[in-house]
């Protein structure tokens, strides 16, 4: 795990993604300048933490790159009412898997 991010930060980010997506599905409209843009900046910080993580036999460069791009894509998509629930769930599970992998790996 990156020295700049904690387990709490990863879990909080995952929860916030779900919360924002649920609100968007319920018709909430987010203001770009005051709500979406700060969250996108935060998501880029989380992606940077992933970029700082060490590689291993499972967490390869290709996986790292995909996790980082999925984080930023999902951070934007979570604010769109018409974004597919199935796709949101798959992407959320994907980054969750790698967050938990890195947390467990680096806590040993």
Predicted regions and their residues:
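Short terminal alpha-helical segments
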Residues: 1-34, 92, 96-99
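Extended amphipathic alpha-helical scaffold segments
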Residues: 13-21, 47, 68-75
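Charged, low-complexity C-terminal accessory regions
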Residues: 24, 39, 105-108
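Short acidic, glycine/proline-enriched loop segments that cap or flank alpha-helices
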Residues: 27, 31, 55-59, 82-83
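Short, charged, amphipathic alpha-helical segments
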Residues: 30-41, 61-65, 86-93
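Short, solvent-exposed, charged loop/turn and helix-capping segments
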Residues: 44-63
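Amphipathic alpha-helical binding modules
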Residues: 69-108
């Amino acid at each position: 795990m990156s020295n700049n991010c904690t387990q709490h930060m990863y879990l909080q980010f995952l929860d916030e993604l779900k919360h924002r997506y649920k609100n968007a599905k319920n018709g909430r409209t987010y203001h770009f300048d005051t709500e979406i843009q700060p969250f996108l900046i935060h998501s880029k910080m989380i992606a940077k933490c992933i970029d700082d993580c060490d590689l291993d036999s499972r967490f390869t460069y290709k996986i790292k790159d995909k996790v980082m791009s999925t984080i930023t894509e999902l951070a934007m998509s979570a604010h769109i009412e018409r974004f597919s629930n199935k796709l949101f769930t798959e992407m959320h599970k994907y980054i969750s898997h790698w967050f938990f992998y890195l947390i467990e790996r680096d806590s040993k």
